């Protein structure tokens, strides 16, 4: 039974330990076979004859205590091998009580959450009613003064009711009452489909002003992502605002409640699956036991399971049905297909054309690299004079795409291995269900960028050597700029193409990182900032793009950027910004979480900022005496940074180097079964960390061009980051498993004052 492949990885410790129970059954079977080999056939055959003749005796006796703990008494301990079976039933009881207790606790949690969502729905419906009433009165008043045309009035039947009441000389109350009754015709079965029979809507039906009483006791919670609300949270100012009845507010409220319903439905689905899989596991293991021992214990034990909360509770199913009915009615206008697609998105199908396209682009990249090497060799393009000029100008432009492609390849490898070892990366990053990219999609994007960049390089070299296009040198120099602009356009295009949800998620996270510490720091925010820390050379290349094309150097293929004081100043800022952004994020987390460890982490990034700035000072300063000082100080601070960062990587980010662990110098829980992988990863991390010091110390190699050394070191840092990514998320996943954290917290739109 492939039991482990179906359960939620965050709850894996709460499931029946089927594997261990199976080993106990094998022990019983091994003893039975050993007994049979030594003359135990007679007793076994007599047992079989008794069963065939209908003479059966009870094997087990099940009971439950006042503390809702189930116990099994094994009645055949006097038989040979009875002690093995006794151990089996004791462990079976422990496993069953564990899952039953966990399930009962989770059911209690979802019932409480259902009550909270119930109150939120009351407030939403009251909000809608209030808006409808205000809109009706407003339209009726405008119609009375001739502002609204008869055609517009005819479109809204409820407005017509109000007009008739007003024209008869009566008050608008009749119209309001009629409109309210029409609304409740649609909402009259709200109590039947939602969570609790005692619903505040019944009070609303008894009085036209009852819903106002609900609205009087609530306020709107500010949107979680809003800059203002996050600033207020740091300043300890209330994040609750008075109700404003506008369509924009209604839209935001509905969006939040939709997210809450989706997450709540997902939790119910997990619980339903949890109950089914555990009952199935218990049934399977007891069937195996009965088959080996020729007893009939499964029937008695499964009766106890069926009577327990795990086997008999129908609260989850009822809640799920009610949630689905309410969601479909309130948010999709009764369209069940649309509603269920939102609540339970269908998994994406693997498309063969994606596999083919990814492989095709990978083959194209390999062919283009071979062609590039052949062209450079045969045409002798990069001669002594041209090589220096090309390496100082065109190489930094094109290496940008190489760094991006390499990083995406490493990320694709991360996704592949996360899936292999069941790391729930989509939950950790907070991706919307069904929108996360797979490793093939990431490879497709990365290979597309790589293939286009190589095509541009070949086109550039070919246009330079071709007499017909040699006069268009300025145009050939613009090819990398055109590609960079095309990438930027694809990244920000608002249309639903090119993985829009992933692009929007990336841009939102990037904005949060740039605006640190004004936004609450989440894992995607600091994870992206860490990626940019390893892409410092890419950021410098972008600055070089602005200088090279903005100041017109591309027309003569000259690099005069480093002669500019402005360029050198921004070089400091660009190089240090990712690390400084991480420092600000650490400070924000330290203030919010009251965690001093975040302060130490922030100090680590400040040391890196100092080391990077000293390295930049050594690079741009022409005075040899000062260069020696900059290099010495840079070497000291970079060595401090490397030691500090290496320790933090291994101990805090990866959770390794635990002396008291059952896996010496690693950690208790390891997803990869081969421990040597962790040792190798630690060694590689240390070596590549020290290789990073080359960016600060800038050692010269006579046989290798400086730009080549820079590109190699930057690539090694990207590879190190890719390795770091896997173990960082593995550790985060194991923390979630230890805390049974399988669902994200969702902010609700309404805040009931009486609750606080």
From Swiss-Prot:
PROSITE patterns assigned: EXS, SPX
EXS domain span: 562-756
Record CDD domains: SPX_PHO1_like (cd14476)
Top-rank taxon, per record: Eukaryota
Keyword presence, Nucleus: no
Single GO cellular component term: trans-Golgi network
Domain SPX: 1-303
Entry membrane topology: Multi-pass membrane protein
Family statement: Belongs to the SYG1 (TC 2.A.94) family.
Protein name per the record: Phosphate transporter PHO1 homolog 6
Species this protein is from: Arabidopsis thaliana (Mouse-ear cress)
